[in-house]
Each structure stands twice: as structure tokens, then as C-alpha cells.
Amino acid sequence: MITRRNSLALGTALGAAGLATPALAQQRPLANLPSTMVWSVYDVGSAGYVEASAISDALGRAHGTRVRLQPSGTSIGRILPLRQRRASHAWLANELYFAAEGIYEYATPDWGPQDFRVLMGRRNAFSVVATRESGITKPEDLKGKRMAWVPANSSVNIKVMPVLAFAGLTLDDVELVQFPSYVASLRALIEGRADCAGAAVNTAVLRELEASPRGISWVQLDPGNERGWEAMRGVVSFAEPIAETVGSGVSANNPANVMGYRYPMITVNADTSEDEVYALMKAVDESFALYKDVNATMPRWAMSEAGTPPMDAAFHPGAIRYLREKDQWSADTQAWQDGMIRRNDALRAAWAEFMPGARGQAPEAFAAAWNERRTAVLGSIS
């Protein structure tokens, strides 16, 4: 269900896309597709919220499905409703990886590695952005430079580290300059208080950097550098090459070779009905024409793109069934899936063994002990 608040956020885009015509409003039932759903999503105004709104609107028009969007500005605020089954689906970014691995805010006795699965997810692009005057264009140029850093922004920080690893660098090789927020860290480049920062390529505030005298430059990650990409995937499993053409400082004629990741990813509990997941995959795929023109990134929800790995968690069996029918499930994809299942199973088993002796520890000691155990487990299955 698109509420009045949702409609205000979406009205212009959906109207411009021509989605309100009577011909497109004809509805037909789809077997096993729930008549009502609750989706936990990013805050109102975010890209994730707009995309969830557009797709839920399309499902309503095509099948009469009513979707209530439940926005939250925090990682826990999006994942907790899914875990507690107050939401049927969560539209997540890298907090899915954190929850599946039991790291950062999920390295606490109340959480640990979670058993979630994905349906599909849109490709997004990330790298380290720099001022053009800094001369930074590749990972090795980052050594000794002033990097804007937000200590509490785990989802950005975890993607900066693999960019450094591409050139064999770590956080010790850069000068970290702390800022209170993501936007503040990017404005620091405009103000000359930092040389570089981690950022999604389509971040709106970077248009200001692009237009400023300092100019904009992206750290390019050579897609042919196998050693560099292997080093990146040693830090995070979800990294993939992408030639980004949408965003600040890039275009179809001037793409940036950067790190691809998924945002948002449609996520469910592992034990969600296979038939329901299959039905939602089919509905999202077959209603693609109703939402693909809402903005420049919506075409990336095409199943041929959004139904491929890597993701931050393994695919749900219902999603796999649909992808097989679409002839989109290869031997390589199955090998990736098997590895992700093995990884999650090993981490959850290790957590079950770890917890009895770890309860009662101070939070920092608990997290440190679990991270040590997690590192050992992942080393044993690699």
C-alpha cells in the first residue's frame, strides 16, 4: 500500500514515468503472492525508500498487493522487524553482511550471525572519491593522504578497507581525519580539510565537489587486476567490478571502474515459504515495465542484473527456483551459493559453541573474543 506520505515522495516520478494509465492498472492475482506485506526499508527520501516505493506501487497495480513500508534510519531498526517477523521483507545494504557475519553492532550476545537469505539486489557503485587537485586516481596514491573518516559509519568504512587492500595498504597507511557524519566527510573535500573519503558514486552532495574548483576524481580499480580483486574479496566477500556511468564525475563516455556492491537487497528469513519467495520474484520481474523508468538506476532491477551474485548473504531456495526457470543459475553461481551457505553455517555453529563461555564479558571484550573466533573459523574454511 502506498500511503499518502509515500505518494508525496513518489508522485512526480511515477507520474512522469506514465504509471497511472488505466491500461497498466488492470490487476490479476498471482498464486502464492501474499495479499499484504510489510517491508522494512531505509529512511524516507533515501534511494532505497524510493525504489521500494516504486516496486510496491507496481505490485499493487499489477496484482492488487498491499505493501506497507516501514522506514528506519538505523541498521538495527531495519533488521529487527525482520528477525521478529513483524516485517516480511527487509530492503538492506551492508548491514545484511554485518548481521550474517555477526560483526559490528551484531557482535553482541543478543545477536550473532543471523540466518537470512536474499531474493535479489540492485548493483550500486562505491570507491574512494578524491579532489582532482590531490592527484589521487588509483589505490596506491592513497598512501599518506588525508582520508575523511566517520568512526560510526560501519557500512562505508567496511568498503574503504578493501579499496586500500587492492594496493596492499591498510588504514595505517593513510591519515584518518574524523568527521561526525557521511555528508560532513564529503564536504570536507570541498573545504580542503581532507583529500579523499569513501563514497557511493551517486551520492548527491558530490555534485558540489564536481562543480567546485577542487574538482572530483575517483580511485579507479582495474577490473583486470586479479590480484587486487582477490585482495579485496579477502576483506569483504561481496565486492565485484563495475563500470559506473551514473553519478558525480562519471558518464557513459567517462565511466569509473570501481567496486560494485548491492543496495538495496530484498531479504527474508531463511525459513520463509519457498512458494511465497518464488511468487514475489515472479511479480517483481513481470512488473518491471511499471517501474523501470522511475529514475536512472531502476533499470538495474532487471532480473538479469539483480538476480546474480555476489550478494551479502546466500539466495533463498524460492529465488533459486525462479532463477533456474529464467536460465540464470549457472554452475559458477551454484559454487558461490554453496560457499556462502558453508560460511554462514560455520559461523552460526561457532557462535553456538562460543556463547556459553562468553556471556558476562564486557561488551568490548566480548566483541574482540568473537572476532578472534570468527577469523579463525573463516580461515579454516577458506
Task: Describe the role of every protein-language-model region.
Residues A47-A54, A58, G77, P81, ...:
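Extracytoplasmic/secreted proteins, especially bacterial periplasmic and envelope-associated proteins
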Residues N94-L96, Y104-Y106, S134, L171-D172, ...:
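Pocket-lining segment of extracytoplasmic ligand-binding domains
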Residues M1, T21-S35, P223:
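C-terminal segment of N-terminal export signals and the immediately downstream linker at the start
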